[in-house]
């Protein structure tokens, strides 16, 4: 069909862009559409290879490919991006990359309709091809192209196919280019997708119902973190973006649902580092009539199952070390870990006045940190780096766990809460959920006092949530898992932005605030 009139070229284009546009004009002059509306793609590159497997190297077994073989009765219609192009007089070879793989193409003046216009194909162009497979003299399975169609002209050259994008920040800023040219980039995000699908399937099979809570909230609770603010024009009201999924899921337990979960984005107005991004994905679930022991078993099943799903084994490599997700996971008592690993800590760490003096003397850089947060500071400094394989950190102090139930055996000191750490950072956080409305109000009021004293990360008092608790919330276990950090581990990624398709980045030329190392520690409630 005739091409629609194209807009005039802008002024000031780069000479490479002009050359590519000239090639597009030449293809149009040869009778091709510049921007077709669709293309009848019937297969992917992997389908051709699956139909004609090669022999296993060194064994002579598996496939039957021999140089010169051809299957003219077979027809494949593929589409993808051209990543290599070699013209040889009356023939040309190209590499076509699609979502799942790459295949070599062969064009010939004798057999390929529109052969002359292939000389106007630029690296990065997306084309459609039809043809049959054959084996070259060197034994490479190749598609002999009989028909082809330019689908879109790439106006910019691709980075080197050998090196990809080397600059880490540029990879994140130009993710669309990174996905094109960096080896393994797409596979990371495909693994992340499989990971989330596995979690959903597991929870659905266990009777959990997926729900969606509000992103805009009057009171952003469920964690200790600074929220982002936004103004609603029609209501003339300042709302907050959610920092957790917790409190609305608990309202659903009050309403009668017994097993609920949500996988969604949360937002915390905090710094950025290798394990923190202000916008990140959480799984939170709540299970009526369960406690944190039931949740611990569920966590072991989910995490070990995910390792098997992604790697086919409980053991896999992360940053040069072998991690072992074989259940059961190791366990460490929170206060016991502090006493064992913090040098000079020979007193009860719950004596916050002594802890303040102890830290002021040894860690003067923490003098502005609220006393109760020094517990997590010390744990993060001395204990977390020791937790290589997945480890349950059990029974956190009540002063840092405002939404957890007091421990049934040690109610005066600690709560029924655990976190899972692996390779030095937190993956999961879980509680036996507090459902005593008066106890919860007392803890909220303590947090409100901290907020009045200047702690802008103290948990706000949510009166509607307290009212819901007064109607009666069943005993329950709750869990939060940081999906992005889990994806880091399972894809051997050093930074959280390597597993976020579009991570938050500072404006070019600006500076990012470093993350407080207590930020986002409360990944669930």
Curated annotation (Swiss-Prot):
Residues that bind Mg(2+) 2: 426
Family annotation (InterPro entries): Aa-tRNA-synt_II (IPR004364), aa-tRNA-synth_II (IPR006195), aa-tRNA-synth_II/BPL/LPL (IPR045864), Lys-tRNA-ligase_II (IPR002313), Lys-tRNA-ligase_II_N (IPR044136), Lys-tRNA-synth_II_C (IPR018149), NA-bd_OB-fold (IPR012340), NA-bd_OB_tRNA (IPR004365)
One Pfam family per UniProt: tRNA_anti-codon
Gene3D superfamilies: Bira Bifunctional Protein, Domain 2, Nucleic acid-binding proteins
Subcellular location: Cytoplasm
Predominant cellular place of this UniProt entry's protein: cytoplasm
Obligatory cofactor(s): Mg(2+)
Binding site for Mg(2+) 1: 419, 426
GO biological process assignments: lysyl-tRNA aminoacylation
CDD domains, alphabetized: LysRS_core, LysRS_N
One function term, GO molecular function aspect: magnesium ion binding
Region forming the signal peptide: none
GO cellular component, one term: cytoplasm
Reaction catalyzed: tRNA(Lys) + L-lysine + ATP = L-lysyl-tRNA(Lys) + AMP + diphosphate
Keywords linked to the UniProt accession: Aminoacyl-tRNA synthetase, ATP-binding, Cytoplasm, Ligase, Magnesium, Metal-binding, Nucleotide-binding, Protein biosynthesis
EC number: 6.1.1.6
Binding note for cofactor: Binds 3 Mg(2+) ions per subunit.
Subunit details: Homodimer.
Family from the record: Belongs to the class-II aminoacyl-tRNA synthetase family.
PANTHER family the UniProt entry points to: LYSINE--TRNA LIGASE, CHLOROPLASTIC_MITOCHONDRIAL, LYSYL-TRNA SYNTHETASE
Protein name per UniProt: Lysine--tRNA ligase
Species of the source: Deinococcus radiodurans (strain ATCC 13939 / DSM 20539 / JCM 16871 / CCUG 27074 / LMG 4051 / NBRC 15346 / NCIMB 9279 / VKM B-1422 / R1)
């Amino acid at each position: 069909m005739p091409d629609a009139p194209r807009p005039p070229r802008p002024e000031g284009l780069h000479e490479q862009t002009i050359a590519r546009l000239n090639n597009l004009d030449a293809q149009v002059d040869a009778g091709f559409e510049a921007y077709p509306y669709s293309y009848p793609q019937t297969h992917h590159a992997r389908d051709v290879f699956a139909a004609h497997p090669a022999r296993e190297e060194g064994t002579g077994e598996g496939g039957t490919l021999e140089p010169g073989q051809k299957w003219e009765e077979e027809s494949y219609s593929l589409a993808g991006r051209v990543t290599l192009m070699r013209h040889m007089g009356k023939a040309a070879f190209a590499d076509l990359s699609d979502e799942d793989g790459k295949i070599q193409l062969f064009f010939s003046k004798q057999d390929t309709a529109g052969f002359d216009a292939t000389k106007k194909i630029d690296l990065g162009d997306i084309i459609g091809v039809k043809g049959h497979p054959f084996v070259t003299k060197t034994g490479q399975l190749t598609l002999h192209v009989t028909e082809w169609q330019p689908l879109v002209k790439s106006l910019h050259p691709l980075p080197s196919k050998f090196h990809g994008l080397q600059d880490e920040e540029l990879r994140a800023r130009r993710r669309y280019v990174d996905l094109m040219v960096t080896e393994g980039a797409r596979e990371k995000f495909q693994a992340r997708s499989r990971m989330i699908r596995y979690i959903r399937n597991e929870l659905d099979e266990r009777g959990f119902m997926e729900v969606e809570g509000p992103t805009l909230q009057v009171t952003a609770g469920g964690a200790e973190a600074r929220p982002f603010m936004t103004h609603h024009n029609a209501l003339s009201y300042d709302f907050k973006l959610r920092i957790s999924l917790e409190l609305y899921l608990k309202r659903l337990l009050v309403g009668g649902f017994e097993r609920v979960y949500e996988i969604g984005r949360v937002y915390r107005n905090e710094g950025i580092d290798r394990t923190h991004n202000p916008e990140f994905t959480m799984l939170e679930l709540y299970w009526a009539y369960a406690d944190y022991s039931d949740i611990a078993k569920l966590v072991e099943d989910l995490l070990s199952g995910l390792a098997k799903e992604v790697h086919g084994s409980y053991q896999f490599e992360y940053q040069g070390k072998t991690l072992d997700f074989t259940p059961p996971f190791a366990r460490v008592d929170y206060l016991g870990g502090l006493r064992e690993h913090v040098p000079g800590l020979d007193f009860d760490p719950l004596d916050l006045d002594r802890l303040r003096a102890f830290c002021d003397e040894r860690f003067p850089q923490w003098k502005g940190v609220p006393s109760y947060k020094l517990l997590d500071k010390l744990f993060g400094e001395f204990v977390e780096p020791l937790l290589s394989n997945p480890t349950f950190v059990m029974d956190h102090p009540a002063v840092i766990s405002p939404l957890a139930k007091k421990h049934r055996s040690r109610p005066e000191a600690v709560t029924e809460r655990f976190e899972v750490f692996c390779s030095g950072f937190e993956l999961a956080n879980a509680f036996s959920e507090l459902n005593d409305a008066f106890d919860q109000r007392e803890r909220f009021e303590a947090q409100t006092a901290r907020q009045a004293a200047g702690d802008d990360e103290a948990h706000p008092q949510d009166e509607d949530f307290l009212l819901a608790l007064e109607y009666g919330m069943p005993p329950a276990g709750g869990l939060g898992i940081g999906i992005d950090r889990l994806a880091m581990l399972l894809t051997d990624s050093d930074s959280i932005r390597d597993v976020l398709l579009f991570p938050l980045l500072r404006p070019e030329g600006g500076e990012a605030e470093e993350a407080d190392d207590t930020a986002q520690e409360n990944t669930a409630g």
